[in-house]
């Protein structure tokens, strides 16, 4: 295996060396053309000298001279990736931003998370034209999600057709923007064209011939009076399932056995035949590939956007933006075998409707609306910007092609409405900025100040009765009336800042912010960032800041009840009697300290190198408590959730705790309760390198790029177990699996190297991503997935008359989700399926994907 990695590392080293060589050649040549490479190595125009508006309240910072690491990704960069949406395109463009490639549980397979610097998406703030975009109404954690208690902005809902460019700040910025900006900020800048536009059609499919995706995108700019514009954008994407299976082994039975009289009999553990029975005749025609849970989700997305501006006299401008998205998505769930329906759930009537079992499908219908209107201008020497923003996200969930094993069939439903989640956010904001000439400084002292008011509302609505009664809908139990909730909160903030060039080479920027939230109190944050130009080509930059992540309303009021043959599970609202009885305390904001130190080198206009080291300390990370309760289905052997036999005293302790909340566990039943809580402190350290170069040759322009991210997260402290639980065994605020989810979400390192070529009307791009090893845990057993290389190719041509065409293939060598090694598989998996796939892998199950695109620009 090590030998196989040598060529890969060598090839990346060659790309780096060539890029450095190209930069050195331009530095040596006095006649080098004043061109710079794009941030992602595609054929788009240079972005290194573009003025950026993210991460500072000053107005003259660029990617090159920024005091913090920032990336600018153009619309052309995004399109050249050939990805379905903004989230996937950003993942291709930024090694510091990653996404789990494998299948994720329940709604998380449809509302995808991501990691910036190996941390939860809840720590990344998303802006549109500098205004806060809301997080999803969905909260992760209770149904197998990877980020307990966190909600995040769904980047896939932002229409790519409306985007002019993206600015990604890789640093803490809570002192500028408030909650969530711990690991960074993604600022989506919309198109502001008053004329012209474009229409594109893209289609592709996996190398297996499925997973077909078709996207139609359009933009048009219209004038609004003499000095205004209205930019309209829209897109429609339809993605079909790429079917991937978990194949049952030949010896694994799917149907109940039959006795000598032909009556069905429940199978023994691992679906073995009981004594005196024979296999069901239906086994002869069973489908061993019926379980297609590894298939990619399907969805239909329609997204619209408008960005407008109009002058109000000489000194002011009105501006407005709005986006609307509507997505219906479906994710295939685990197949329900007829043997399981009959034996485990004891629901033979379901076989009247599903005699061969069934494959449930989880469906979400999601609507996202955002809108901002404001006025900005210059009055009395001040630049003033006042705005109002409204955001809303609604997720309605359905279980299709399913059953409730507690109901009688035929007659009971097979499709269920599971309930809705709704999150609304209203923001009023006022920003002021002014430059003051101070003789001691090399540039004006830019002073900024502002105030913000925010109102939030969260609702969880119950589903239909059949979706949650008894066992509930198979695959996703609906929200019950007891789980339903409505909650609101308000917050207000004031902030100040000052920035200047102390000398011609030394830039200094300071900011402070105070916020007060109606539910958990006040938080103060600060930030100091600086840059020193050692020479005209070499600079040093550093930042120190603190930040916070406010516990979402969805996390504070989360409650979900589930039932299965193993018992009833309750994720209790943290302020409920059940949670309080088990030691829950109010959720506190997660607080962070950020430190970064970096250098930049620009020996010529055609070369840029940046190296940044960072440390992020987070205190009070959110997590989920242990499940407290016991299984009394065998009264002679009372066990906890781990299977440990409890003493009479331990059982009595649990009974007493739950009894204070009016909960009792009857003989023959099982019950377990948990809740969200602040579990502990983490430290994330990493190193980021970006190299960009541009080279003129006789046979065209070459654009080189290389980026790498190395990161590591460690657990610094685990909070104490509540006193009321300390006499119980196996109570942990941070289990081993939870620790792995926190520490090893991403590979140990990621490298991305790209080469773009342009000659006349022809363009081509190749980029390779080298994912380092990643630690994994399955069935309590540690293992490691080895490094892997993914290659992407694309080419395009200008056809004349505004027409262009492109072809590409992503994942050329068809790398797919890898297997869990045999020694880490559970006995149940070994006895039932041929292969256990690593659903936490960076690789997806889809494999190679080709696409073609036609674009018309007018």
Question: How would you label these PLM feature ranges?
Answer:
Residues 136-137, 618-619, 712-715, 769-776, ...:
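C-terminal beta-signal and adjacent terminal beta-strands/loops
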Residues 31, 614-778, 857:
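Gram-negative outer-membrane beta-barrel transporters
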Residues 350-352, 358-371, 390, 402-507, ...:
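Outer-membrane beta-barrel transmembrane domain signature of Gram-negative proteins
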Residues 86-89, 93, 114-115, 127, ...:
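N-terminal periplasmic accessory domains that precede
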Residues 59-60, 91-137:
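Extracytoplasmic beta-strand/coil segments of soluble accessory domains associated
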Residues 482-491, 537, 547-618, 667, ...:
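Outer-membrane beta-barrel signature, preferentially recognizing the C-terminal barrel domain
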